[in-house]
């Protein structure tokens, strides 16, 4: 019986006077009903509706990132230094030559906004170039750089074109985010895998964008910005209102 729930009896309250009834504050249900009516009148999306409802009743709660939840590491509070590296297949490089660099820069930009210390990506790029454009594994990076955490985003696919519709634009991508912590074993630093998360990204989810209303380069930039935020939110905690859906 230790784990059984016990229902407490309801307390009896005296009937309210007419004046007290008139002065009662609206209930939460009444607030929510008013919010729904207001949002519908303003043509707000369902997402905005629930964000507003959540903020009304609960404030703007902080969401724990998958990385924090899965590893116990808080990149902000623990003051960890992070190395971020992206990799893309040749099929992506041949069509979107700048996307690897752009995603790296934009993801790091978002980490820095949270005061997360990040290894200079130019130093990482120089190291890789000096090694013939390749790096063997995360431990190789751990030995060369003074990082506490290594984040490797392995992008499997990336496109900005709607399938079978050259006049329409829609961003699609998928890949895997790997996380490693760096530890010293004997006299050598090694990277230990502590986080793996597959991801898929689609933008916009509903209706593709006409190529007549946006240039391909402008659309690609917007999509890279959105993807960078989605990836960054896997790594640091954020408020519910900041969630990219």
Question: Can you name each region flagged by the protein language model?
Answer:
Residues 132-191:
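Surface-exposed short loop/turn segments
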Residues 1-27:
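N-terminal secretory signal peptides that target proteins for export/translocation
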Residues 94, 163-164, 208-211:
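Short acidic, glycine/proline-rich loop/turn micro-motifs
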Residues 28-32:
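N-terminal export leaders
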Residues 78-152, 191-194, 221, 225-239:
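N-terminal segment of the mature soluble domain
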Residues 34-43:
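Bacterial N-terminal signal peptides
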Residues 47-79, 169-172, 178-245:
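C-terminal/domain-edge helix-coil "capping" segments
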